[in-house]
Amino acid sequence: MTIKALLIDFDNTLVLFNEDQFLVAYAKLAYPYLTDFFDEATFFQKLLQSTLQMIHNDGSQTNAEAFTNNFIADTPSLDFEECNNRFRHFYEEKFHELGDTVIVVPYGRELLKRVLDAGIQVVIATNPIFPELATHARLRWANIADLNITLTTHAENMSYCKPHPEYYQTTLGLIQRSPEECLMAGNDPISDMSASALGMTTFLVDLDQEKGRLGILSKEIGNSAKKEAKRFQYRIDASGSLEDLEHFLFNFERR
């Protein structure tokens, strides 16, 4: 069976960035939209806690709902709709300024174009902690927003995060593909490679450690991944650069 769909991670796979610096810059830009509800320190803690709530989401609500419900907890004056409106204005007006904090991986767009030209579906399997509006802005940063991508996972169409295998089950259901038809590629040896628990082929993308810096959220994801690893056996089928990924994909033979 040949590969019919490539699922590929985004952060530190298609773009490189310093996670903690990004989070601080994000908070600085977003805080002015909610100054009438929180002081700056409280806002940052709310932001972090609500993001972690998405990472640990159990499927009972979308990740976006998990974020907002946690963010407004203990703040009766801020309701669900108003909170979402404030963040939407931020994403529409200021979020684009964070594009300068990422470095585009040079071969990413070319790889995806070649994959699409070969008739293989492409899914941007980014950890879904951003809403759709922000996620598509991030695709523009990577210069891939114009490509015919089948699906991009985001906080509004997902109820789990990586490394939970349920994230991959949901994704495969949306694109109507079996695990055997799909290849998952990304830089994280557990969060991305956990797709193998479903029977997907996996490819570990080499990370430029000098440019891509992991931070507090990745550490929390890593802790979650270690817990998941006790439930499932993960496998790495191949590894290398994005160029190596292309060669592996186009010369794939299922063992």
Task: Map each language-model feature to its residues.
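Short, acidic loop-to-helix structural element flanking the phosphoryl-transfer center
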Residues: 62-66, 82-85, 92-124
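Short histidine/acidic/glycine/proline-rich micro-motifs that form metal-
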Residues: 14-16, 53-55, 126-130, 157-158
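A metal-dependent, Asp-based hydrolase signature
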Residues: 45-93
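Alpha-helical elements of Rossmann-like donor-binding domains used by nucleotide-donor carbohydrate transfer enzymes
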Residues: 25-29, 46, 70, 110, ...
